[in-house]
A protein has these predicted regions:
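Bacterial Sec-dependent N-terminal signal peptides
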Residues: 17-46, 134-151
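Acidic, Ser/Thr
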Residues: 54-58
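Generic structural signal for coil/turn-prone sequence and helix-edge features
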Residues: 130-132
Length: 152
């Protein structure tokens, strides 16, 4: 009889432990908000551009940005997010959101550029990204790498 009561008591305690372990103070029914962000390149004129980005949903803890990079120099399909995220992680500059920068140097007229940004979660993993391709204003081929004005 004592053995039977002991088994019943142990089974009851086991069930209570299972119930307690499955309940937590976190509300699992709360919707998880996936972080999203945007990136916009505007005011493209006379070798300048305005690059802006902001968090739209969710929470992030830091970001990296590539303000402009020639599309012709990218050796992969930037539409594949995993490759783009890795590229920004390796080549980007740490920034905070919201982000705004007026680019006034380094653009070549007529060149297609990509601007890209990624944001990180609390564990340091990239959780969202955004990019935009755009063409620098001006006349293509007007840039000279040499010290001369070219053939006039």
């Amino acid at each position: 009889m004592i053995m039977k009561n002991l088994h019943i008591s142990m089974a009851f305690i086991f069930v209570l432990l299972l119930i307690t372990a499955s309940c937590s103070d976190k509300d699992d029914s709360a919707p998880r908000i996936i972080p999203t962000m945007n990136l916009t390149v505007s005011e493209i004129a006379d070798n300048t551009a305005l690059i802006t980005s902001e968090q739209q949903t969710g929470t992030t803890f830091g970001a990296k940005v590539i303000d402009f990079y020639p599309v012709a120099d990218i050796g992969f399909d930037y539409n594949i997010e995993v490759k783009l995220v890795k590229f920004v992680e390796e080549n980007g500059e740490p920034v905070s959101l919201p982000y705004t920068r007026k680019v006034t140097e380094g653009l070549r007229p007529g060149v297609n550029y990509i601007s890209a940004i990624i944001a990180y979660n609390a564990e340091g993993r990239a959780v969202c990204s955004a990019f935009q391709t755009w063409k620098a204003a001006g006349t293509e081929g007007a840039w000279s790498d040499g010290g001369s004005a070219g053939d006039l």
